[in-house]
Amino acid sequence: MVRRRTASPSPSAPVRSAPRPAAQSSFAAPPPRPAAAAPAYHPPAAPTPMGAPMGAPSQGPGLMKQMAATAGGVAIGSAVGHAVGGMFTGGGSSHAEQAPAAAAAPAGAPQASGYSQPCEFEWRQFVDCAQNQSDVSLCNGFNDIFKQCKARYA
């Protein structure tokens, strides 16, 4: 006989006895058998396929490159916004047309007089961007400005 450490018996489900068939019926069904609780069969989980080992996530451009790209985008957006606004308002006087052109150029940008070709400054901006950026699509704004300059001087 197994000894228990606790004084009280472990809790279990109450056991009911089946009612006894009456003696009058000779075709009574046999008493139901208690169902044995068989554990359900669970097949082992299939191992997950091993892919390439997870490496360190690739880092994007540095903080300074992101700031430069953002500043370039802001400058391009400002230039395009002024150009579109000038088209809608008709440009006004010649004084009003010169102000957006001066505002669109960065403060340290060299003037066109230092270059031999009319759109050389815009071309160099595009080339510098393409050489410094890993994604050339970030330089599409410089390319568009260069194309606008070529169309203006063609």
From Swiss-Prot:
Chain positions of motif Cx9C motif 2: 139-149
Keyword Disulfide bond included in the entry's annotation: yes
Pfam families named among the record's database cross-references: CHCH (PF06747)
Cysteine pairs bridged by disulfides in the record: 119-149, 129-139
GO cellular component, one term: mitochondrion
GO biological process, one term: mitochondrion organization
Biased composition (Low complexity): 7-28, 48-57, 96-109
Highest rank taxon of the organism: Eukaryota
InterPro entries hit by this protein: CHCH (IPR010625), CHCHD2/10-like (IPR055304)
Motif range (Cx9C motif 1): 119-129
Keywords assigned: Disulfide bond
Annotated stretches, region: Disordered: 1-64, 86-109
Keyword Protein transport carried by entry: no
Range of residues in the leader sequence: none
Database matches in PANTHER family: COILED-COIL-HELIX-COILED-COIL-HELIX DOMAIN CONTAINING 2, ISOFORM A-RELATED (PTHR13523:SF2), COILED-COIL-HELIX-COILED-COIL-HELIX DOMAIN CONTAINING 2/NUR77 (PTHR13523)
Full protein name: Hemiasterlin resistant protein 1
Organism: Caenorhabditis elegans
